[in-house]
Amino acid sequence: MSCHVLERLEEVIRQRIREGNPQSYTYRLYSSGLHNVARKVGEEAVETAVAALAEGEERLVQEAADLLYHLLVLLAAKGLALADVCKELERRMK
């Protein structure tokens, strides 16, 4: 099974940032600045690790999804894309 949903999610994130709707969580997070976005990624990473150690599989999957979403927002905040990460992963597999 492929995970094209990450590419679609990345596009939704970029669209929400472009639209600048203050009702959008994505836009509010992005607008709060790089420091806050990075802090949120850290929080989600810890929650994912805790879920892996102390909670069930369903909770782990939920936290992993949150982490991936916030990581995509962080990449967008730095002007990077999922494709940049994929290229690096491919380079490492050679």
From Swiss-Prot:
A GO cellular component term found in this entry reads: cytoplasm
Q: What is its EC number?
A: 3.6.1.31
Report the subcellular localization.
Cytoplasm
Q: Mind telling me which InterPro entries this protein's record contains?
A: HisE, PRib-ATP_PPHydrolase-like
Which PANTHER family does the record associate with it? HISTIDINE BIOSYNTHESIS BIFUNCTIONAL PROTEIN, HISTIDINE BIOSYNTHESIS BIFUNCTIONAL PROTEIN HIS7
**Pathway noted in the entry:** Amino-acid biosynthesis; L-histidine biosynthesis; L-histidine from 5-phospho-alpha-D-ribose 1-diphosphate: step 2/9
Q: Which UniProt keywords apply?
A: Amino-acid biosynthesis, ATP-binding, Cytoplasm, Histidine biosynthesis, Hydrolase, Nucleotide-binding
Gene Ontology annotations of biological process type: L-histidine biosynthetic process
User: What protein name applies here?
Assistant: Phosphoribosyl-ATP pyrophosphatase
Looking up HAMAP family in the UniProt record yields: HisE
Record field: catalytic activity: 1-(5-phospho-beta-D-ribosyl)-ATP + H2O = 1-(5-phospho-beta-D-ribosyl)-5'-AMP + diphosphate + H(+)
* Chief subcellular location: cytoplasm
Q: Which SUPFAM superfamilies match?
A: all-alpha NTP pyrophosphatases (SSF101386)
The family line of this record is: Belongs to the PRA-PH family.
Q: What is a single molecular function from GO for this protein?
A: phosphoribosyl-ATP diphosphatase activity
